[in-house]
Amino acid sequence: MAMQMQLEANADTSVEEESFGPQPISRLEQCGISANDVKKLEEAGFHTVEAVAYAPKKELINIKGISEAKADKILAEAAKLVPMGFTTATEFHQRRSEIIQITTGSKELDKLLQGGIETGSITEMFGEFRTGKTQICHTLAVTCQLPIDRGGGEGKAMYIDTEGTFRPERLLAVAERYGLSGSDVLDNVAYARGFNTDHQTQLLYQASAMMVESRYALLIVDSATALYRTDYSGRGELSARQMHLARFLRMLLRLADEFGVAVVITNQVVAQVDGAAMFTADPKKPIGGNIIAHASTTRLYLRKGRGETRICKVYDSPCLPEAEAMFAINADGVGDAKD
């Protein structure tokens, strides 16, 4: 009997070892959830067991054909497969030490970010036009494909473009700089143009389905807020806009948690025209208000320097000190500023 228990325990550990990373939703079928219900979950945009485990019960009940009793059972089974309880700070520290950072292409900028853009969290870059937001995004779309020992993420990139500023030629120039095959680099970037705020959110459901199929290291949304400025106007629609934006950012955070991808979003700025603006040296602030401020893990403020030089400042971060770094925009992507 003891021997049999030992064998079962070994089998369990081997299953656990195999299920490194997100688990496909089909795993729930082995736990007694009917194939029909699993199909309904998949159609509603749940492609992994983690997505189900992290979802509030209300969200599952809203799916046609899922009753409250079924939702309880599904959540109970998902919770068995996904560790969601307390853990010691030691274990968490160990997990944090395994987080990969993706190089930005500039040594100074990487030093400021203590290694590069962090995976598994949201990094927001905001600034005026011509401050290098889109150029950093293009460079990251290539560097995330590099091997880990070269500062990459060994994965594909996903690019959601809402402003029509994506240029594959820029990717080819960066690929040449790193000695990568141009055609392979372009094949590894999934591109989508977002046309309105609902479409932008819909693209994230497709993104989650694609992330189950193959390994992605980076998700870029450039810009996350541009369409919100045009789809919603005036104070009357402000609360509806913020609720929609909060839902979009929540989905981004869920993708970062589920798949461990680095999420990079760009944001626009608005000039402050109130009385306080007279007393601030730089009267610009990022749009999206507190909702976007709380959703982003790291916020970077970009501004122009002399010539091709740009300055990046850590505006808000849980662990990076408030400091600045200079970088340059070159023909082959983002690099270090020349003295």
UniProtKB/Swiss-Prot annotation:
SUPFAM superfamilies: P-loop containing nucleoside triphosphate hydrolases, Rad51 N-terminal domain-like. GO terms for biological process: cellular response to camptothecin; cellular response to ionizing radiation; chromosome organization involved in meiotic cell cycle; DNA damage response; DNA recombinase assembly; DNA strand invasion; double-strand break repair via homologous recombination; interstrand cross-link repair. The modification Phosphothreonine is found at residues 13, 309. It holds the Pfam family Rad51. The modification Phosphoserine is found at residue 14. Residues 48-77 form the HhH domain. InterPro entries: AAA+_ATPase (IPR003593), DNA_recomb/repair_Rad51 (IPR011941), DNA_recomb/repair_Rad51_C (IPR013632), DNA_recomb/repair_RecA-like (IPR016467), DNA_repair_Rad51/TF_NusA_a-hlx (IPR010995), P-loop_NTPase (IPR027417), RecA_ATP-bd (IPR020588), RecA_monomer-monomer_interface (IPR020587). The modification N-acetylalanine is found at residue 2. It is found in: Nucleus; Cytoplasm; Cytoplasm, Perinuclear region; Mitochondrion matrix. It comes from the Eukaryota. There is a cross-link at residues 58, 64 (Glycyl lysine isopeptide (Lys-Gly) (interchain with G-Cter in ubiquitin)). Its main location: nucleus. CDD domains: Rad51. ATP binds at residues 127-134. Ubiquitinated by the SCF(FBH1) E3 ubiquitin ligase complex, regulating RAD51 subcellular location and preventing its association with DNA. Ubiquitinated by RFWD3 in response to DNA damage: ubiquitination leads to degradation by the proteasome, promoting homologous recombination. The modification Phosphotyrosine is found at residue 54. GO terms for cellular component: centrosome; chromosome; condensed chromosome; condensed nuclear chromosome; cytoplasm; mitochondrial matrix; nuclear chromosome; nucleus. One of its GO terms (molecular function) is ATP hydrolysis activity. Residues 184-257 are annotated as: Interaction with PALB2. A motif (Nuclear export signal) lies at residues 245-260. Keywords: Acetylation, ATP-binding, Chromosome, Cytoplasm, Cytoskeleton, DNA damage, DNA recombination, DNA repair, DNA-binding, Isopeptide bond, Mitochondrion, Nucleotide-binding, Nucleus, Phosphoprotein, Ubl conjugation. Plays an important role in homologous strand exchange, a key step in DNA repair through homologous recombination (HR). Binds to single-stranded DNA in an ATP-dependent manner to form nucleoprotein filaments which are essential for the homology search and strand exchange. Catalyzes the recognition of homology and strand exchange between homologous DNA partners to form a joint molecule between a processed DNA break and the repair template. Recruited to resolve stalled replication forks during replication stress. Forms linear homooligomers, giving rise to a RAD51 nucleoprotein filament, which is essential for strand-pairing reactions during DNA recombination. Interacts with BRCA1 and either directly or indirectly with p53. Interacts with XRCC3, RAD54L and RAD54B. Interacts with the BCDX2 subcomplex RAD51C:RAD51B. Component of the homologous recombination repair (HR) complex composed of ERCC5/XPG, BRCA2, PALB2, DSS1 and RAD51. Interacts directly with PALB2 which may serve as a scaffold for a HR complex containing PALB2, BRCA2, RAD51C, RAD51 and XRCC3. Interacts with RAD51AP1 and RAD51AP2. Belongs to the RecA family. RAD51 subfamily. PANTHER family: DNA REPAIR PROTEIN RAD51 HOMOLOG 1, RECA/RAD51/RADA DNA STRAND-PAIRING FAMILY MEMBER. This is DNA repair protein RAD51 homolog 1. The gene is RAD51.
